[in-house]
Design a protein with these regions (language model features):
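C-terminal substrate-binding/active-site "lid" region of AdoMet-derived donor-dependent transferases
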Residues: 209-275
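Short, histidine-centered active-site or binding-site loop motifs used for metal coordination
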Residues: 79-81, 192-194, 225-227
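Composition- and surface-driven signal marking solvent-exposed, interaction-prone regions
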Residues: 203, 236-237, 280-282
Length: 332
């Protein structure tokens, strides 16, 4: 994302310079000045010291070792801790939102250990696919990841073993979903939204309708959503999900509940959600509806379903291909 921003900025500078030159007579000295400014801009953009171990077309990417666990690794995209994996134990889940995604899978998917047909929008460090492979042998998983260089790093430095049970498709997620068969998946996981850049075409009602097409009637859609204290994007995205799916729940993360930036997780299906099983899975990490934590000093997440969810979503925007101001919603 950072690379794209820099590249777009340079293109805009060059375009603006060309337009300015075209509309006036410019001396040789002025032209040299313009060229010098452009050169300084370019050198500045390329020559800035970067913590990147790998600079891809989309990310400044690094892998950090866990100082407290020899087998622990954190994937950093730009300057954000995106994913964590334990190379020796794929069932060890470090991040709150990843544990909630797994809670949703285990609460609403088939019986424990039964294989899944899973699709992932965004790969990260492949943390959830590793978990599913370890806990549900025989699962068939498809990972849709736009950044091929990221895939290389995950395989080479995070020891992901690409076998016949996992297909990795490099390219745009929406185009890839369009190629999937009807009723072919029991699980779709969305983890393509960042805190600084949201691919709006993966947030719209039209795209979610395509996700619903791919899911079986009993399948579930689970997505990680990052937003700020105003929760405008979170509310809009969950409201949009509710336009497509009959049964929806949202788990507001501890950061959101405490009025900060943070992750939340939405769960959706055309079949009733197993709310009791979900509550058991969440335990003390999440409270239900308006209930309060039994420890007032401990900030926890919050699950909203039914009337509580309807009240939360009242007045929220519905995102469509013609109207999806995701950047403004996150910034608002």
């Amino acid at each position: 994302v950072t690379t794209l921003i820099v590249a777009v900025g340079l293109v805009l500078i060059a375009s603006g310079t060309a337009m300015w030159v075209a509309t006036r007579t410019v001396s040789a000295g002025e032209m040299l000045g313009i060229g010098g400014l452009a050169a300084v801009s370019l050198v500045g953009a390329v020559g800035v010291d970067s913590p990147c171990e790998t600079q891809t077309a989309y990310y400044c990417l690094s892998v950090l070792e866990d100082p407290d666990l020899k087998s622990g690794r954190t994937l950093v995209l730009d300057d954000l801790r995106h994913s964590y994996v334990d190379l020796d134990d794929p069932t060890r889940l470090e991040f709150w939102y990843v544990r909630r995604i797994v809670d949703a899978i285990e609460a609403h998917a088939t019986s424990p250990g039964v294989p899944l047909d899973a699709v992932y929008l965004g790969g990260g460090a492949f943390t959830v696919p590793r978990y599913v492979r370890a806990t549900r042998p025989g699962s068939i998983q498809t990972i849709l990841e736009i950044d091929g260089d990221l895939v290389d790093v995950v395989e080479e430095r995070l020891d992901f073993d690409r076998q016949d049970d996992v297909e990795i498709v490099v390219g745009d997620g929406r185009l890839a979903v369009d190629e999937l068969d009807d009723d072919s998946a029991s699980l779709v996981v969305g983890d393509a939204f960042g805190s600084r850049a949201v691919p709006f075409h993966l947030a719209t009602k039209e795209f979610l309708a395509d996700v619903e097409r791919v899911l079986r009637p009993t399948g579930i859609y689970v997505a990680n959503i990052i937003d700020g204290p105003a929760e405008k994007f979170l509310r809009a995205e969950v409201a949009t999900v509710a336009e497509v799916f009959n049964h929806v729940a949202v788990i507001r993360g501890p950061g959101i509940v405490s009025g900060r930036n943070g992750n939340s997780v939405v769960i959706a299906s055309q079949s009733p959600l197993n709310e009791r099983s979900l509550a058991q899975r969440l335990g003390r990490d999440v409270r239900l509806g308006g209930a309060t934590s039994d420890d007032p000093d401990r900030v926890v997440g919050e699950v909203l379903v039914g009337d509580d969810l309807a009240q939360y979503l009242d007045g929220a925007d519905i995102l469509t291909d013609d109207f999806a101001p995701v950047d403004q919603l996150i910034g608002g």
